[in-house]
């Protein structure tokens, strides 16, 4: 049986990740939403050009909006439409989910932080979380815990031998 070439097809549907989110925030409750996109944005996402690192989600007039995400336009896409790579993008959520988010953001002081942007079948979805900002000492404690975990694994590996 022939060995499959792993370089031919990437099974990971992720377009972009916000790697700093778990470092800068305590991520609590996760959600998934669709995005309202224009045609040139979909083409850009199919090419894998997106950045959600410095983005966040805000609520206005009972709607959720993605701000700060950059989808740079392709050179060959959409010559008749003005492409704004930093425009606000509407998130597609149920009324119940929106009401839940509004309550937690306004009353309990949460922020809404995007975690990843990915394909789900033919649709672009965004995964985001309710988050509270970490203080500097929280970040240091996380680094300390991570280093201790690595050291512990190393000690266990050498003690088995």
From Swiss-Prot:
It is found in: Cytoplasm. It comes from Psychromonas ingrahamii (strain DSM 17664 / CCUG 51855 / 37). GO terms for cellular component: cytosol. Pfam families: SmpB (PF01668). PANTHER family: SSRA-BINDING PROTEIN, TMRNA-BINDING COMPONENT OF TRANS-TRANSLATION TAGGING COMPLEX. Belongs to the SmpB family. PROSITE patterns: SSRP. Its main location: cytoplasm. InterPro entries: SmpB, SsrA-bd_prot, SsrA-bd_prot_CS. Keywords: Cytoplasm, RNA-binding. GO terms for biological process: trans-translation. The lineage of its organism: Bacteria, Pseudomonadati, Pseudomonadota, Gammaproteobacteria, Alteromonadales. This is SsrA-binding protein. One of its GO terms (molecular function) is RNA binding. Required for rescue of stalled ribosomes mediated by trans-translation. Binds to transfer-messenger RNA (tmRNA), required for stable association of tmRNA with ribosomes. tmRNA and SmpB together mimic tRNA shape, replacing the anticodon stem-loop with SmpB. tmRNA is encoded by the ssrA gene; the 2 termini fold to resemble tRNA(Ala) and it encodes a 'tag peptide', a short internal open reading frame. During trans-translation Ala-aminoacylated tmRNA acts like a tRNA, entering the A-site of stalled ribosomes, displacing the stalled mRNA.
């Amino acid at each position: 049986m022939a060995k499959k070439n792993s370089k031919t097809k990437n099974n990971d549907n992720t377009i972009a990740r916000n790697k700093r989110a778990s470092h800068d925030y305590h991520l609590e409750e996760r959600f998934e939403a669709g995005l309202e996109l224009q045609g040139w944005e979909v083409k850009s996402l199919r090419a894998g050009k997106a950045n959600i690192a410095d983005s966040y989600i805000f609520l206005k007039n009972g709607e959720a909006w993605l701000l700060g995400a950059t989808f740079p336009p392709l050179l060959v896409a959409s010559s008749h439409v003005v492409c704004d790579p930093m425009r606000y993008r509407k998130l597609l959520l149920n009324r119940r989910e929106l009401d839940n988010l509004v309550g937690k953001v306004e009353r309990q002081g949460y922020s809404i932080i995007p975690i990843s942007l990915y394909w789900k079948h033919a649709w672009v979805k965004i995964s985001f979380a309710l988050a509270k900002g970490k203080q500097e000492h929280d970040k240091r404690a996380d680094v300390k815990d991570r280093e201790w975990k690595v050291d512990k694994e190393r000690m266990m590996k050498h003690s088995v031998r």
